[in-house]
Curated annotation (Swiss-Prot):
Any GO CC annotation of this UniProt entry: nucleus
Disulfide cysteine pairs (residue numbers): none
The protein's name in its UniProt record: B3 domain-containing protein At5g60140
InterPro entries: B3_DNA-bd, DNA-bd_pseudobarrel_sf, Plant_B3_domain
Family matches, as Pfam families: B3
Length: 328
């Protein structure tokens, strides 16, 4: 099965293929129905990139016979091994029309898109109803600079500096992030404070009668005027002094638009672009790391509001976050 979508600079085509170990060799045969999506001038090699950031280069050739077929050669076994594929996983290949394939995996048991694997080969999947996606989260919270955050040095403003910023041991303290970002925050009586959650979560504000507040609808319309494309997903954020320097992508935005993220992403403001790393936790929560440099260079105040517009490809892969700061 293959489908077509649109990139901002052209068209993209996609095909789906189940992984069957008994039929899998060192080559990957493309579906015959996908032949019409290939360019007349075939590339000698193609680049395959998984959603977790792994990249492979494979040969690309045409096979003769009664029916013309096209094959990715010399490297498919490595992809199977690197991504720890299981029989029945559904594979998605999105072609940019030239020589590049974005590669996604849908788990055979949950049918959820796999985001990233840990070093122990565990599968991290965003699931509707997971702990990360509870609407009681304080999803309007963003972090501020923390001097302990080694991914957020003062030598910012350049892509190169952000590329080398890492924790001392090369690992990320996921437990600390969860605790400080409020996912398991509880009162002294051991119960979650629902009033605080409602106050912090401004996405689905409702009156007592269960209807959306008209003022909230007007605010949403007012915020969309700052977007380059009113159809793009977006969210609003304000600073929270209790957070580390990471920008949390609200789970409901990811779920509603079926968004996926690469290993690194571009953050754009009026001063230019910064390249930042994406962090995907085991529970599926997604963060932009090293966001303190963005806060510093814009000299943001606690009363300022950020409108974050997510720009994506035809396959809903987010490549850029454009941030508009509204002075408070």
């Amino acid at each position: 099965m293959n489908t077509r979508g649109n990139y901002s600079n052209g068209f993209t085509s996609k095909f789906f293929k189940p992984y069957l170990p008994s039929e899998s060799g060192d080559d990957l045969v493309l579906p015959i129905s996908f032949n019409s999506c290939l360019p007349k001038s075939l590339p000698k090699t193609v680049t395959v990139r998984s959603i977790s950031g792994n990249i492979w280069k494979l040969g690309f050739k045409k096979c003769g016979g009664e029916v013309e077929r096209f094959v990715m050669v010399s490297g498919w076994k490595k992809i199977v091994r690197d991504e720890n594929l299981n029989g029945g996983d559904l594979l998605s290949f999105e072609f940019d029309g030239s020589h590049f394939f974005n590669f996604s995996i849908f788990d055979h048991e949950t049918t959820c898109k796999r985001l990233k694997r840990s070093s122990e080969q565990s599968k991290d999947i965003i699931k509707v109803g997971s702990d990360c996606e509870e609407e009681s989260q304080a999803s309007d919270d963003v972090i501020v600079l923390n001097s302990d955050d080694s991914d957020d040095s003062d030598n910012d403003y350049s892509v190169e500096d952000d590329n080398v910023a890492e924790d001392d041991d090369g690992l990320e303290d996921e437990v600390d992030v969860e605790a400080e970002d409020g996912y398991d925050a509880k009162d002294s009586d051991g119960l979650e404070d629902e009033d605080d959650d409602e106050a912090e979560d401004g996405y689905d504000a409702k009156d007592d009668d269960g209807l959306e507040d008209e003022d909230d609808l007007e605010d949403e319309d007012d915020e969309r005027r700052y977007l380059d494309d009113h159809e793009n997903p977006y969210f609003t954020m304000t600073l929270n002094p209790k957070k580390k320097s990471q920008l949390h992508i609200p789970a409901h935005v990811i779920r509603d638009y079926d968004l996926t993220f690469p290993e690194r992403i571009t953050v754009v403001d009026e001063m230019g672009a910064l390249e930042k790393a994406i962090k995907i936790q085991k529970n599926g929560c997604i963060f932009v790391k090293g966001f303190g440099s963005f806060i510093r260079r814009n000299k943001m105040k606690m009363t300022d509001k950020m409108i974050c517009e997510l720009k994506r490809t035809g396959g809903n892969l987010v490549h850029t976050i454009k941030v508009k700061i509204i002075s408070g």
